[in-house]
């Protein structure tokens, strides 16, 4: 991979916190193929940027380890010269293009009124006159069109050359990129049954990743300074370092938002399935990029551990309450909360094959006893919800649970049976997938009893649609 990545950014973009996170990381890694074209016009929606910003951009960017080039953004020769210079750069580069917003507009040039509002028909006439532009709307002058076609032909030649190289190396490249997931998951399921151990689902995830990273070249892992807690780094990983990109694991530092944005970029590039870890409570720092993963239909996997009040000693600031409900409300996002090692394996399996849907794996810190002890070729977690226990053929109530609370639901079901109150327990690792099932299957799961109960160590909001108005929801609707 030797191509450049060009970023177009404005004044407002560089006020955002993610710009500091991402540029700091890029500078640290010396990403020489990264070039940012900064439209430096000193105007934002409210007015001049001086209302809110007095940064020394040159010092700021250079302190991150970036090269800085200042040019007149309206001078094509300066633009060309700067772009030529960055081709041999050893660092990421900012080309600060000093421009005037609304250029050519007699009444709105250099003003915030031209930022997000139409110029208006009368002002457009004045702009045409100012720029000596006599062509009809949407008419491309012949000279410009001719030059554009030349660029297209140049690109076509490069593409043809690349296709020829790919054709000659197709078998080798396809072998590198081929995912051998099916065999791995089949084996891991059998290992889980044979070992029959209690373990945290974050540990189950690590064991699954260990098997996947041993034989796979498409997974790019990482963590926001929590690798040892998220269990995202395996013994097979090689760390990506400055000037050494022949690796598959990124130490993102405490940069959750940038990590999520980088993973989106890796997925959009193609041939990679990125995953990154942090605590579930910090999913709020990742939220804008998680939403974009879903909106852009990218296969990005977020490993979110310490997923309930069972996380340990950190207290209410680190105990997720509303996070699961919020994440489950995002369209085209699969939020998985596995109950044991077998479910964790199946959740990973579904996440990796979801080419147009990102996934969140909500995992525990505390140990979970194995629940499913028989091998099944069927991925039950792909159904979103399934019956995991029934105390009698004819039952009185249905108990829904996810993750660490499934074992609690099973224990409660057995105790109720002693009092001749019979029930079935539904493990619901992914509400999003269950909602996509056929009506007949949903009726089978939901429609058997009038009395329904849900148990989850988090906000109860997202369970009410399953248990109904007469149901009971056991959860936590206050801070921990």
Predicted region positions:
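Thiamine diphosphate
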Residues: 1-6, 19-139, 146, 150-362, 367, ...
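Short loop or secondary-structure boundary microenvironments that flank
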Residues: 12, 72, 253-256, 279-280, ...
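Short acidic, Gly/Ser-rich segments with clustered Asp/Glu that frequently serve as metal-coordination loops
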Residues: 12-18
């Amino acid at each position: 991979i030797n191509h450049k990545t060009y970023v177009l950014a404005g004044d407002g973009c560089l006020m955002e916190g993610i710009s500091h996170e991402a540029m700091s990381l890029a500078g640290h890694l010396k990403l020489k193929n990264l070039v940012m074209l900064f439209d430096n016009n000193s105007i934002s929606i409210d007015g001049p940027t001086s209302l809110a910003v007095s940064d020394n951009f040159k010092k700021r960017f250079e302190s991150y380890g970036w090269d800085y080039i200042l040019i007149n953004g309206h001078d094509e020769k300066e633009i060309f010269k700067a772009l030529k210079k960055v081709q041999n750069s050893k660092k990421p580069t900012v080309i600060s293009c000093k421009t005037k917003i609304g250029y050519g507009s007699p009444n709105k040039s250099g003003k915030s009124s031209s930022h997000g509002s139409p110029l208006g028909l009368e002002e457009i006439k004045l702009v045409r006159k100012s720029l000596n532009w006599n062509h009809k709307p949407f008419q491309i002058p012949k000279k410009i069109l001719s030059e554009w076609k030349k660029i297209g032909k140049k690109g076509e030649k490069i593409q043809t050359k690349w296709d020829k190289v790919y054709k000659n190396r197709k078998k080798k490249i396809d072998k590198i990129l081929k995912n051998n997931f099916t065999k791995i998951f089949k084996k891991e399921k059998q290992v889980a049954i044979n070992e029959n151990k209690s373990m945290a689902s974050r540990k189950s995830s690590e064991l699954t990743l260990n098997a996947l990273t041993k034989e796979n070249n498409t997974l790019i892992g990482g963590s926001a300074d929590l690798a040892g807690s998220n269990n995202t780094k395996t013994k097979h990983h090689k760390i990506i370092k400055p000037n050494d990109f022949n690796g598959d694991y990124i130490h993102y530092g405490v940069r959750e938002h940038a990590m999520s944005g980088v993973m989106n970029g890796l997925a959009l590039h193609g041939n990679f399935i990125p995953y990154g870890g942090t605590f579930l409570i910090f999913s709020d720092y990742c939220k804008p990029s998680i939403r974009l993963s879903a909106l852009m239909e990218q296969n990005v996997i977020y490993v979110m551990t310490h997923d309930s009040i069972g996380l340990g000693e950190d207290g209410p600031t680190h105990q997720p309450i509303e996070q699961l409900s919020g994440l489950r409300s995002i369209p085209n996002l699969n939020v998985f909360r596995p109950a044991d090692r077998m479910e964790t394996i199946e959740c990973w399996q579904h996440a990796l094959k979801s080419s147009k849907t990102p996934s969140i794996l909500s995992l525990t810190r505390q140990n979970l006893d194995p629940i499913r002890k028989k091998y099944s070729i069927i991925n039950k977690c792909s159904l979103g919800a399934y019956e995991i226990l029934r105390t009698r053929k004819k039952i009185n109530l249905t108990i829904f649970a996810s993750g660490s609370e499934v074992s609690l639901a099973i224990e409660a079901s057995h105790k109720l049976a002693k009092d001749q109150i019979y029930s079935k327990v539904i493990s619901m690792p992914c509400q999003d997938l269950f909602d996509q099932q056929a009506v007949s299957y949903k009726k089978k799961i939901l429609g058997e009893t009038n009395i329904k109960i849900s148990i989850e160590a988090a906000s109860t909001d997202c369970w009410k649609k399953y248990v109904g108005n007469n149901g009971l929801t056991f959860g936590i609707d206050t801070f921990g």
